[in-house]
Amino acid sequence: MKLLVVDDSSTMRRIIKNTLSRLGYEDVLEAEHGVEAWEKLDANADTKVLITDWNMPEMNGLDLVKKVRADNRFKEIPIIMITTEGGKAEVITALKAGVNNYIVKPFTPQVLKEKLEVVLGTND
């Protein structure tokens, strides 16, 4: 299963990718910002999950989510936002934009596992 991780921090991308690898997800694409993420998503339409930060240069995560949701190819792709923006207003804004689940940094691998299971419908 192909996943796309978007974060301007190479350290955070590595942490997320390593966590996904331990969970059995090996086909993980990476992008540094929303513009690069859109290009990768456009070229890899078989991507099954998008995991994105909010605050990034060039195109932030919220604008990326809106662009993804506006494209019929990706209307149903599960999106998890992982960000430091943890206020109620931010969560509501993200959910209204089309985010399926929300994780506030810092987070544990267990939280990412559970959120992935929820968006993929594999939770028991």
Swiss-Prot record:
Maturation and modification: Phosphorylated by CheAY. Dephosphorylated (inactivated) by CheZ.
Origin: domain of life: Bacteria
Disulfide bridge map: none
Cofactor note: Binds 1 Mg(2+) ion per subunit.
Residues given in the record as Mg(2+) binding sites: D7, D8, D53, N55
CDD domains registered for this protein in UniProt: REC_CheY_CheY3 (cd19923)
Keyword tags: Chemotaxis, Cytoplasm, Flagellar rotation, Magnesium, Metal-binding, Phosphoprotein, Two-component regulatory system
Pfam family for this entry, one: Response_reg
GO process terms (BP): archaeal or bacterial-type flagellum-dependent cell motility; chemotaxis; phosphorelay signal transduction system
4-aspartylphosphate: modified positions: D53
Chief place of localization: cytoplasm
UniProt subcellular location: Cytoplasm
Single annotated GO MF: metal ion binding
Quaternary structure, from the entry: Interacts (when phosphorylated) with FliM.
Task performed by this protein: Chemotactic response regulator protein that modulates the rotation direction of bacterial flagellar motors. Plays an important role in the colonization and infection of Helicobacter pylori. Upon phosphorylation by CheA, interacts with the flagellar motor protein FliM to cause clockwise flagellar rotation and bacterial reversals, as opposed to straight swimming when CheY1 is not phosphorylated.
Entry protein name: Chemotaxis protein CheY1
Organism annotation: Helicobacter pylori (strain J99 / ATCC 700824) (Campylobacter pylori J99)
Organism lineage string: Bacteria, Pseudomonadati, Campylobacterota, Epsilonproteobacteria, Campylobacterales
Gene: cheY1
